[in-house]
Amino acid sequence: MTDIRVHTERLEMAPLTLEQVDALLAGDGDRLRELTGVLFPRPIAPPPYMTDPLPDVRERLRRRLAEAPWWNWLISERETERAVGSVSFGGPADEAGAVLIGYAMYEQFEGHGYATEAVKAMIDWAFQQAGVKQVRTLAPVWNTPALRVAENVGMRPVASDEDDDVGEVLVYAVTARASVESA
């Protein structure tokens, strides 16, 4: 896999490799530092909402390593080299050209605009990839910060759904054209 990195003024995003996912799941901070060059908050654990899907991501990476950019990305502060969270795609674009994006910050890094900055950059990256026409996210109606991030990056609500675990979920989306116009 090539060394893909996306940079913003304050942040760097890099797709997690199979070895990095293994170290994260094992809680091995020294190995993570060696593999990523990034310091992780203690105790070593995936960012919120990433713990459950990470074993599945590991299996996908084992089968299709070339798809690593379509799964989980580590978000780190460029200046301090600290892990602040994760942004993830739900896999490569579907037949309609849509990809799903999700994001989570470690608690101590919430409220600093990192999620908005990272998600905006990753949406821009996604639209540079062949076949991507739309980026979507799902946010529970009660998760005001997630809704705010979606709106701040130019997404608009397009549907709602019911989730057994979290209740009503809004589906937000942005198209390649709308993303360029909001830049």
Q: What are these model-predicted stretches?
A:
Residues A150:
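Conserved active-site tyrosine of GNAT-family acetyltransferases
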